[in-house]
Amino acid sequence: MGKLTILVLVAAVLLSAQVMVQGDGDQPADRNAVPRDDNPGGASGKFMNVLRRSGCPWEPWCG
């Protein structure tokens, strides 16, 4: 019974090593990409960012 357990463990290790080496063909950066935060200041930062992009008519608001 002990030899069977060791054989099963060795087979599991070899199989997991093969899966890690081969992978599934996708790049982790593509699959798990996180969108960039264009507005790190939250809602007020987003408002100021929109004003800057649209050509703010009032200079003190644009910063």
UniProtKB/Swiss-Prot annotation:
Modified-residue entries (Cysteine amide), positions: C62
Residue segments, region Disordered: 24-48
Coiled-coil parts of chain: none
GO MF annotations, alphabetized: ion channel inhibitor activity; toxin activity
Post-translational modification D-tryptophan, affected residues: W58
6'-bromotryptophan modified-residue sites: W61
Organism: Conus radiatus
Family statement: Belongs to the O2 superfamily. Contryphan family.
Residue(s) carrying 4-hydroxyproline: P57
Annotated Pfam families: Conotoxin (PF02950)
Record's comment on post-translational modification: The differences between contryphan-R and bromocontryphan lies in the state of bromination of Trp-61.
Disulfides per UniProt: C56-C62
Name of protein: Contryphan-R
Residues making up the propeptide: 24-54
GO cellular component: extracellular region
Additional free-text comment from the UniProt record: Contryphan-R and [Des-Gly1]-contryphan-R exist in two forms, due to cis-trans isomerization at 56-Cys-hydroxyPro-57.
